Each structure stands twice: as C-alpha cells, then as structure tokens.
C-alpha cells in the first residue's frame, strides 16, 4: 500500500487495521481483480507472465462462499486459475485447521495453487504438513537472519527443504538479503528465494520495466 506523503506502507501496519474494521475483504477482492486485469492486459500485449501470489486474510474463512467470487472474477477476465497462488498465513492455518483444509481443497479443485506463508513464524507443526493440501511452503525470514553463520539454523532449514521435497511441496525462502544466504539455499536445493537481495517491493510500472530489461538482456523480443 502507498500514500503520496508516506510512500509504501508495510502490510504489517495496515492489514490489522483493515481486519478490525472489516475493510480487508473488499481490499482482498480489489487486489485479486487488479491481478486478473493485469494478467489480461499482459496477455493482450504479449508480455511475459508468471504465477502471482495473493495473500488472503483469515477473515475470509468466516465466509467460504468467497471462493465462488474468486472463480467468477477469473472467468470474467479469462484467466487460468493456476496462474494465481493463494497465500494463507501460518497463523490462519493452525487456528482453523478443519475449516481451512476444506476451503483449501475447494480452492485447489477450482485450479488455484495454495501456499502457506510465514512458515516458522509461529507454532508450526511439521507433522501437519503431510495432511495440508498445499503446493508451496514459504519459509519465514526469521530462519535466515542467522543462516549465514549459524550451523543449527542451516540444519533446520535444510531438513525442512528436504522434507518438503519428499512431500512434493515447493519451498520459497523469504527475507533473503545476502549472497551467502542465497548460495546456501541453492546448495540445499531450495526451489526459490525472495528478498531485498533480488528486489524490493515496487509499483507495477517498475516491475514491468524490470521484466522488460531482463528479457531484453537475454535477447528476447517482446511486442
């Protein structure tokens, strides 16, 4: 979120406020719609597209009918659901396991990918991973604050990555800020990494320029 005076505002600041006043559901649907609009525009412009992750608030768990609205929006803009990854936070998952598992299965049946965000930030249960219908596990940045020099942290992260692979779950490491962290994650077979080392949050115009620049460097032409 951005304002003209303060610039980018962290989701950690405005999301709790919106969850309290009930505006979060409207915000989530607005974001989802904008993503679908952009996918359609990129498709029309022959612009490279990649799956996009969208965070959904735990508030939606109180109204499972929201899935039909997500499906309606994707059909309106003729977007394949598998281009969208629905992110649910660790805290939401472990607070409402029975309800959420059913919702996750329904989302997957529609075609959406499911990811568990901020894994490791709370009281995660490794045993529960075998039952969760998720496609992607996003490791919380707390794992990597000391990963460059803490042997125990490296062992924990490596074990989680290997276990996820055995469960056919992709792993994304959040909060990567150093080359050493990225190299460690590459060596243990982590699927993807994100963090300030690669890019900071940016407006869509900057994102599009970044993609165009990188593709032009590779010698690919985009109409």
Predicted feature residues:
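Catalytic core of bacterial c-di-GMP phosphodiesterases, primarily the EAL and HD-GYP domains
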Residues: 1-4, 17, 23-99, 175
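Residue-level signal for well-ordered alpha-helical positions
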Residues: 20-21, 150
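Conserved functional hotspot residues or short segments at active or partner-binding sites
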Residues: 103
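Conserved, function-defining core regions and hallmark residues within catalytic/recognition domains
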Residues: 14
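EAL-family c-di-GMP phosphodiesterase catalytic domain
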Residues: 1-6, 57-64, 83-98, 110-223
